[in-house]
Amino acid sequence: LAITSCYEDKGNYDYREMNDIEISVETESSFYALGDKVISKPELVFTLGKENSDLSYEWTFDGHVIGDTKDLEWIADTIASTKELRLAVLDNNTGVTYFGSTYISVSSAYASNGWVVLSEKEGNSTLSFLREQTEEGILKPVVTRDIYSMINGVPMGTQPVSMYPHWTERWDGEDKTSWLWVAQKGGQGAIDISGSSYKQEGILSQMFLSKSYPEGFVSVGVIDMQFLTMAIGEDGTIYTRVKDSNLLFNSSNFLDRPLTSDKEGKIKVDGSMIAYAPFDEHGGMVLYDKNSAQYLHIADYKNWQGYNYSGKVLPLKVEEYEYGPSDARLDNMKDYSVYFVGASLVDWGDISYMSIIKDKAGKFYMQKFKVEAYGGGSSVTKVGASFISQSEIKGLDAVIDGTSKNCFYLCRNQDKAPYLFISKGETLYFYYTDGNKLYTCAQFDSPIASIDAECFNNKYIIVDTI
C-alpha cells in the first residue's frame, strides 16, 4: 500500500485556501491472474473536511489508462510484475491533480498459485491446471482441462508417467514460473513445457549428443537441478547432462553413457527411487541405489571459482557409533528391501530423510537420517550423514502387502505437518512421524494414483484417483 498526496501547478494564482486531497488506494490482493477482476474503492480525505463536487478520475496500470470513475472495477488484461496501479484525481475548479497508488502484479492465468495435473484420457496424455481459489474459506479450484492441447493445437502424446519442474533461478532466470518436464512412453517421449504459457519448449530425445535416445531407453522421469539434469529410464538407468548456465533451463547435451557408481564405469546407478528435494542449498539429491544396495548422493554443485562437481556419485559416511546393534547401515542395505525414501527441509544446507524399509522377517521400519550439504572438492569421496533412528511401524504390513499399488508423500515441512501419506487402493493412510503411529485418513471411490501436498506449509493435500 502506498499513500501519496501531491499536485501539479497549472498556473492558477488565485490565492485562496486549497481543499487538498489525500488519496489512499487499496486492493483485495497484490497478485492477480489475467481475467481476474481488480476492485478498488479509494478513500479520499479533504483537508477542509468538505468533498469537492467537480472532480475527474483517471486510473492507470503500468502507465496505461484503465478507468475513469472513482471506484475501479477492471478485468486484468496486462501481464506485469509489481507495477503501479495509480489513481489521478483532478480538481476541475483549481486545475490541481492529486495522486494515490499501490503496486500489484498480474500474471498469466496459468502461472498463478495452483496445481498442474498429469493424467490420461482416451489414450492421450493430458495436462489440467487447477488455479487456487477459495470461497468463504473453502478451497474451490478453477479448473482448465487439457491445457496443452488447447495451447499447442495438438495432443501431447500417450502413456504419461511423471512430471517434474525445472530448477528456477530466483532473480535472473528464463521464467520464474518454471517449465515442466513431462515424461511419457508414447508420442514424442519426454517433452519440456513452459509453466507460464504451456507451449512446448523442447523434446528430450533431441537433447542427447546423438539427437536420439540411447538404445532401449524409455523415459519415465526427468529431474532438473541447478546444474545437473537426470533423465531416468524405465529400467532405472540414468543419463545426465551438466548445464552450461543455471540461468537457462536447457543448455548443453545429455551424455550417451549411463551414470555409474564405480571407478571402472560398470555398475549403473539405479534411479527408480530418488528422494526428490527441490532445495538447491543441499548441493545435490539422495537416492537409494538397489544395484549397490546403498544410499548415494548425486552432486549438483559449482564452486565460486567456476569448477563444476555436478554429476559426481558419492556414498554417505556415518560414524559407526551412531548405529544401534540392529540398525540397517546406510551404506549396506543388502538385508533390507527399501520401499520409499523422501526428503524434508531441516536447516540451511542439511536435509532430513525418511525411508520405509522391510527386513527379511517381514517387519517394516521407519529409517531416519540427515545428510550434510555437499560443498565440492576433488578430495571429497563421501558426503557426511547422521543416523537418527530406526523404528518399527506396526500395522504397515497390512498396507504394503503387494496386492495393490502404494503411493507415498512425505510432507516437506515436518515442523508444520509431521506426516507421511501412504495409499493402498482406495484408502489413504498417514503415518505420524513424530509419534510413530499409522492412521487411516480417508476413503475414496476409486484407487489412488498419486498424492501431492507441495504448497505453502503443506496446507493442502491433493489426491488423484483413477
Predicted regions: what they are:
Residues 110-116, 177-180, 229, 285, ...:
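Entry beta-strands of beta-propeller and related beta-repeat scaffolds
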Residues 145, 170-398, 439:
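Preference for solvent-exposed, low-hydrophobicity sequence contexts
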Residues 2-5:
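C-terminal motif of bacterial Sec signal peptides marking the signal peptidase cleavage site
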Residues 7-154, 458, 464-465:
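Acidic/polar, low-complexity intrinsically disordered N-terminal segments immediately downstream
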Residues 384-409, 436-462:
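Conserved blade-ending motifs and adjacent loop-strand segments that build the rim/top face
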Residues 94, 134, 371-373, 435-438:
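Short coil turn/linker residues within repeat-based beta-strand modules
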Residues 354-357, 361, 400-413, 417-428:
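Terminal low-complexity/disordered tails
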Residues 157-164, 219-220, 336-343, 396-411, ...:
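Beta-rich, blade/repeat-based domains predominating
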